[in-house]
Amino acid sequence: MANPRVFFDMTVGGAPAGRIVMELYANEVPKTAENFRALCTGEKGVGKSGKPLHYKGSTFHRVIPEFMCQGGDFTRGNGTGGESIYGEKFPDEKFVRKQPAPGVLSMANAGPNTNGSQFFICTVATPWLDGKHVVFGQVVEGMDVVKAIEKVGTRNGSTSKVVKVADCGQLS
């Protein structure tokens, strides 16, 4: 069975920015990939937080040029929230893959075994993160969109324009 592909249709400052297509490594980290896939489709309904378990309408709250673009906090929108489809947090699955190149999709966390819904897309190789963040996918189309998002980031992570997931779902 092929790994699932999901998408984000992004806006920057309210204007359409394009589509990011990501392949999820369900063959290597099935629980982590399933969490992200289901949060893209919204199929799990409402979570314990009372908010929909869905990335649609959420923002990329932290964007640091020459590092990464982070999103997935659909409960608070500021990097302090988020929720997995398994409950608030779930354990690290495996550290099979490294962070070797731009476009790597990894779980954001607050230390070991604290995965929720927050994720980041690397814009450069980040080998110092190996073994600390579960790699669960890769951008396969739309790195130009990721680079456009990166341009509205700052060294402290705030964005000069709102970066939003206008729509998202599963392609295959």
Swiss-Prot record:
One GO biological process term: protein folding
Record's subcellular location: Cytoplasm
Chief location bin: cytoplasm
GO CC terms, sorted: cytoplasm; cytosol
Reaction catalysed by this enzyme: [protein]-peptidylproline (omega=180) = [protein]-peptidylproline (omega=0)
Documented activity regulation: Binds cyclosporin A (CsA). CsA mediates some of its effects via an inhibitory action on PPIase.
InterPro entries, A to Z: Cyclophilin-like_dom_sf, Cyclophilin-type_PPIase, Cyclophilin-type_PPIase_CS, Cyclophilin-type_PPIase_dom
EC number, as in UniProt: 5.2.1.8
Superkingdom of origin: Eukaryota
Gene3D superfamilies on file: Cyclophilin-like
Record key words, sorted: Cytoplasm, Isomerase, Rotamase
Segments forming domain PPIase cyclophilin-type: 7-170
Coiled coil region boundaries: none
Example GO molecular function: peptidyl-prolyl cis-trans isomerase activity
Function: PPIases accelerate the folding of proteins. It catalyzes the cis-trans isomerization of proline imidic peptide bonds in oligopeptides.
Family: Belongs to the cyclophilin-type PPIase family.
Identification of the protein by name: Peptidyl-prolyl cis-trans isomerase
Native organism taxonomy: Eukaryota, Viridiplantae, Streptophyta, Embryophyta, Tracheophyta
